[in-house]
Amino acid sequence: MVWVGSPQFDVWQRSPLPVAVYEEASPGRRSAIHSLSLQGRPYKVVYNSASLAGQIAAVESGLAVAALTQCSAPPHLQVLGPEHGLGPLEPMQVAVVRSRASQGSKAVDSLHRLLLQTLRQAGL
């Protein structure tokens, strides 16, 4: 996971830090809140959504920073790190699961290979 912000807005300099997070039970949300708590960094949840598109929109608009999986962070967003006062995030486990009924489907086989290739390239 990585912290992301908009290159047009220095949101990461604000205190408390405005943060966009996923729903309450999300591992991504827990990782973000845990990281900020370990740093003693004051933060305020300003956007809450289960939608990746919503998280990205909140960051693009300069509303907040967000913790996203590296493979879902669009290249036009800025990856933030220690030089921005943001500490590391806990890794998130990712699994690709397919049903027995999908065995032998060329379309599912292709999608399965593509997902695995994408995750490997992202270092997951």
Model segments located where?
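Thr-Gly-centered strand-to-loop micro-motif
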Residues: 22-23, 45, 68
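Beta-alpha-beta core module
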Residues: 57-101
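Short acidic active-site motifs
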Residues: 54
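Secondary-structure junction motif
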Residues: 15-39, 104-106
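Hydrophobic/proline-rich hinge and linker segments of small-molecule sensing/allosteric domains
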Residues: 1-24, 91-100
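Solvent-exposed amphipathic alpha-helical surface segments
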Residues: 39, 80, 118-122
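Short beta-strand-to-loop elements that line the ligand-binding cleft
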Residues: 42-51
